[in-house]
Amino acid sequence: MSLEPPNQSLRSHRQTANPHVMAAAVQKQKPYIQDSTHLQLPNVGDKDRERVGNMVKRRFSARIPGQGVPYDAAAAPSLPVGAGSMIDDAVAAGGVPVTKSKTMTSPAKAAPVASGASGMLLKEDLDAHTFVTQQLATSNAEEVDRFVSKLKSLKSRLVDEQREAMYTNYNSFLTVNKEILALNSEVKSLGQAVSNFNVAVSAMVEDALESTSSKSQESSQSSLALPDSSARNRNSMVMLENMWANELASLFKHVEGAVKYLPAIPGRHVVAESGAWYQLNAATWKPLRPVHMFLLNDHLLIAAKNRKKDNMQMQQTQTLVADQCWPLSDIEFLDLSVSRRGTHPVVPNAVSVVCGGVTCVYQTEKPAQHAKVVSAFKKVAGEGRKNDTNKTQQQIRLRESMTYYAARNPSLRGHKELLQGLSNSKGHSRSSSVDITGRTKNLREIDDLVNDLDVKIAHRRFAEATDIILENIKDDKESTDITQQVLDIKLHQRQDELVAHLIDDVATDTSNTAVTHALGLLVRLGHGDQARGVYLETRRNLIHKRTRQVELLGDIPGYIAQVAVTYFRLIRSTAEVFRKCYTDNHLASSIAEWAKSMVEEFVLLFARQLYGVKPDTQTYQQCVSITRQQAAQLSEVGLNLDYLLDYVLSPARASKA
């Protein structure tokens, strides 16, 4: 009796287990027609069926041992590639094992369809026949069905992506269309604004031309016959002064008594004039009389309108008579149309002039005239304050510079001619306008040069500042050029400031390069002696400071070694810097004397530390060896001071001498 194969279905198993059912099936079975492809099954007798049924019953009644059927594990086939990942995926999905109906295909067959099919199908040069042949060359029906399902899913996914891309492109198109429409509207509005701007500019030009022509007509009809503004040559100081003189002459001609208040002096001129004003009573705010305002660069003139009757022609004429005149520096001009926290009532188009406790109020019916007078007064007052401030500061600087240099240089105390010349050159600006390219220009250049020098000193660009001072300073006491004398005084002041900065750099413990640079500039400026003393004293203090930092912890040779290194190396570096900055041979004695004093200090320190130690001991000999080794470097800079060390290095020879 043969056993059924493992993959036999449950239905066939049940039919085999029931012999009666099996026999009935055999009886109902029609005999096969024998042809070329089928053979007729043999007939089974009753005995055979009974014998088979008994054998089947006996088989199912047998007890199967627990250890199972033994088999040879070595002959079992190997697991497919990727079986571990398949098992992990099944466990992760819920622990459901893979059933027999799900045929496990090898990764070699499934991988191209799963991973590479999408990319290959999207290529334009894809040969569908070749691709399908390669994919399904060794596939069974189930793999073909799986391949078809994947193609369908890929198609649906591509359709969805295409639809989504179409929607996205459509939305982008709508957005761009909206932006284009918005940009088009903005361009149209910008074009409209540009056209409006052009129209406004054209209108302004026309208004300016009309205003110019109307002003020229009004000036010809006004009481003051002022010259045409187009004929004024403001680029020439002489022409400008002539124009101002003509304006004053016209003012004196048409305003009676104006010459009494405003004598003709150079530089005085009319800034603005305005009619249609009324003087108000400061208590009742009622109009008193019509007035005419003339604002000059230094005065405010109020002219009253006086009516005269002509008996011959029986007509009344108006003439202007000077009524009030105040210096601008003595009055307080207030705009009553602006509130000032309750200090005065708000009166439209009105101004108030306060001088010496007397208040005069004036009002006009024309806002343009009010704005004209107020703006002109603010402009003149601002220029006046600026000029006064400049004059005051200039006088203070001049007085301080003269006092400073008179104190530092007694030879300048008797230069009264220089002070008088400076006073004359800094007098009224209108008196020196003819000499516009002469002395005034030189003083301006001096101020620019000094300002540039101050900037370089403030930025610590000392080399450039030194070059400027040496190029422009000329100590010629017999010179009659006032500007050169002023320049020399200011340059001497900046030179002292520069020297103070350089001396501070030398006195500070900085690098040898910075000290060498500062000493070189001081030598060029003529302060080499002062710099030499400061430098040598600074180096002496540095040696003492470094020596005090060395600690004596019982090791005498170690202490002497550190002190010797400090003394002799600093002496050597000081001598090197000194030789670079001071090349004159007669100054070599200064560094030699300084080095001698420092070596003597070291000898005293050596003797004090080794007091009581015999010269033939090892400690003493170690100190002598270290000192000789460090002192030998002084000969490299031309300093031979070995004779000063004989007292401690060779005490026996020193005692014999």
Swiss-Prot record:
Where does it reside?
Cytoplasmic vesicle, Secretory vesicle
* Stated name of the protein: Exocyst complex component EXO84
Q: Looking at the keywords, is Cell membrane present?
A: no
For this UniProt record, the keywords arranged alphabetically read as follows: Coiled coil, Cytoplasmic vesicle, Exocytosis, Protein transport, Transport
Family in the record = Belongs to the EXO84 family.
Name the species this protein comes from.
Answer: Yarrowia lipolytica (strain CLIB 122 / E 150) (Yeast)
Which SUPFAM superfamilies does the entry link to? Answer: Cullin repeat-like, PH domain-like
Q: How does it assemble?
A: Component of the exocyst complex.
Which BP terms from GO are recorded? exocytosis; Golgi to plasma membrane transport; protein localization; protein transport
> Which Pfam families does the UniProt record give?
Exo84_C, PH_EXO84, VPS51_Exo84_N
Q: Which GO terms describe its cellular component?
A: exocyst; transport vesicle
> Entry's InterPro entries?
Cullin_repeat-like_dom_sf, Exo84, Exo84_C, Exo84_C_1, Exo84_C_2, PH-like_dom_sf
Under the heading PANTHER family, the entry gives: EXOCYST COMPLEX COMPONENT 8
- Role description: Involved in the secretory pathway as part of the exocyst complex which tethers secretory vesicles to the sites of exocytosis. Plays a role in both the assembly of the exocyst and the polarization of this complex to specific sites of the plasma membrane for exocytosis. Also involved in assembly of the spliceosome.
| Coiled-coil ranges from the UniProt annotation | 142-165
Q: Show the Gene3D superfamilies listed in the entry.
A: Exo84p, C-terminal helical domain, Exo84p, N-terminal helical domain, Pleckstrin-homology domain (PH domain)/Phosphotyrosine-binding domain (PTB)
| Primary localization | cytoplasm
The root-end lineage is: Eukaryota, Fungi, Dikarya, Ascomycota, Saccharomycotina
